[in-house]
């Protein structure tokens, strides 16, 4: 988004002319310049938006592929199957549990926060990372991403707050299958700060007043903004109410990925901006 603060400068340019020509020329020039600025800004935003969208799409596609790789790993399938058969107190499970430490290498390789395994009933039976103690033994049966995954559908969760790990998260859930039956899921917590940074990377190409941020259907910020009072400690804490939110809200709720809008509106700082809106 780029502020429109050009009218004063253009009007001053015509003070040396007669009154009527000044008003007419200033009006025409201002509107022509405004139109040109909008077109130029929209062009920059389109290029940036397309590049950014492709980058985000490629990132999540790579994580889906990472999840698929894990779901095809025999040691993981065998571990979950053993847990389902013998239970957590069995000698068989205790031996395999130790072997699952190899998943730490995949956390590093795939650049994840954590990998965790869930049995067929929704109980987490193994996890990596600093939140391991919170995740293991926790009940995930009510999570939509688990319900979809245990039904055979690989999926990416929405941004949400977890009462288990006490932070906002996004996860990739992939079903584990053996002999034609879904026996559990392998799940990956993605690094939320990295996703937030990726969304805003390169916004400077639009201009010094360029801004980009992610919101939900109620205007809750999923990222900090680049400018203003919401540039720090605002993600998942602050909401905005703008024309952009009004336009996006119903489209987000219906999942209309084809929706786009380009035009003028007042942003969260009260400034008139050229904005480009889309649903991802």
PLM region descriptions:
Residues 157-159, 173, 277:
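Sensory input modules used in signal transduction
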Residues 51, 85, 91-111, 130-133, ...:
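Solvent-exposed, extracytoplasmic
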Residues 167-169, 273:
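PAS and PAS-like sensory/regulatory domains
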Residues 6-92, 108-113, 155, 168:
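Juxtamembrane extracytoplasmic/periplasmic/luminal helical "stalk" adjacent to the first N-terminal
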Residues 103-106, 120-127, 144-160, 234-238, ...:
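Regulatory sensory and allosteric helical modules in signal-transduction proteins
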Residues 67, 127, 185:
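Short glycine-/small-residue motifs
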Residues 176-184, 217-218, 228-280:
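Extracellular/periplasmic juxtamembrane segments that couple receptor/chemosensory ectodomains to their
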Residues 62-73, 104-124, 154, 201-222, ...:
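Short N-terminal helix-loop-first-beta-strand/juxtamembrane motif that initiates sensory/input modules
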């Amino acid at each position: 988004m780029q502020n429109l603060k050009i009218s004063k400068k253009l009007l001053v340019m015509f003070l040396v002319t007669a009154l009527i020509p000044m008003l007419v020329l200033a009006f025409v020039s201002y509107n022509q310049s405004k139109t040109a600025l909008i077109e130029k800004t929209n062009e920059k935003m389109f290029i940036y938006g397309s590049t950014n969208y492709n980058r985000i799409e490629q990132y999540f596609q790579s994580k889906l592929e990472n999840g698929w790789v894990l779901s095809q790993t025999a040691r993981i399938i065998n571990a979950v199957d053993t847990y389902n058969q013998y239970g957590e107190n069995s000698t068989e499970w205790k031996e395999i549990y130790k072997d699952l430490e190899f998943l730490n290498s995949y956390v590093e390789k795939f650049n994840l926060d954590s990998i965790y395994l869930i049995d067929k009933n929704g109980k987490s039976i193994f996890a990596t990372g600093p939140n391991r103690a919170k995740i293991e033994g926790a009940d995930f049966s009510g999570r939509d991403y688990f319900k979809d995954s245990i039904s055979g559908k690989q999926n990416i969760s929405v941004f949400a707050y977890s009462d288990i790990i006490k932070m906002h998260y996004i996860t990739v859930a992939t079903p584990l299958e053996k002999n034609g039956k879904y026996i559990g899921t392998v799940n990956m917590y993605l690094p939320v700060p990295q996703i937030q940074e990726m969304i805003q990377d390169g916004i400077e190409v639009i201009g010094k007043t360029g801004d980009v941020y992610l919101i939900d259907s109620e205007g809750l910020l999923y990222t900090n903004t680049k400018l203003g009072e919401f540039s720090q400690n605002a993600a998942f804490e602050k909401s905005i109410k703008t024309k952009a939110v009004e336009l996006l809200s119903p489209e987000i709720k219906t999942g209309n990925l084809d929706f786009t809008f380009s035009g003028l509106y007042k942003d969260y700082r009260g400034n008139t901006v050229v904005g480009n809106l889309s649903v991802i």
